[in-house]
C-alpha cells in the first residue's frame, strides 16, 4: 500500500454579518467596489475557493478563483460544486451591481453543463 501524505489547509475569514448592515446604505455597486478596495471584507466563501472579485461595473462582475487539491472530488478532479459556486457568485454579484441600497437578491435556480474537468494544474479560473 502506498503511504499517503496528509495535507492541511487553514481557512480564515471575518464574520460578514456586521459588514452586511452596510449593504443597507450602499448601492450594490458601491458595496462590491468597497469590497474590492478592502474597505469591506470578502465573504467567507472566498476563503474556501480562493475567490477574488477582480472588477465590477453596472451589470457586470468579474471574478477569479484558483482551484487546489482541497477542492478535488473522489476521481481526482475539481468538484463541480467549485465551478457552480464561482458561477453563482459572479452571476449574483452582477445582479447586485444593479441594485439600489437596501435591496437584497438570491439565486432561485442554477444549472451547469460541464465541458471538461479542472485540476489544480488548471490555475486561476476567471
Language model features: what each stretch is:
Residues 1-126:
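Terminal targeting signals and extreme-terminal segments of soluble enzymes
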